[in-house]
Amino acid sequence: VDIQTDNAEMDYSKLADAITPRTKAVIPVDLAGIPCDYDKIFEVVESKKELFKANSIYQEKLGRVAVIADGAHALGSEYKGVKIGAVADFTTFSFHAVKNFTTAEGGSVTWRGNPNFGNEE
């Protein structure tokens, strides 16, 4: 899904049409410390649950398309009082030299709690 014409956020009005039975993830990108509208993203993902075809036990447990955010340019930001890294199902942070937080290379992945997954998973 491309960006909107008046800002750098994804065009949420086109997201629903982009989800097909083959879609496994939506990957929003938080830019310049500004998180995406996760309420809109999750609303669309939930509305398309009937199309989702799981290919693994973890996808079955999630039961819908995963929301995997790129939060590298929003480290420390919040969405409605929740730190980025705890909003999407999974959030990735690159620590490349051009990112807001750098270790020259590397990165991390965070995830929010999901009652269908135990700590061992």
Task: Specify the residue positions occupied by each region the protein language model found.
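Active-site phosphate-binding strand-loop segment of PLP-dependent enzymes
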Residues: 6-103, 109-119
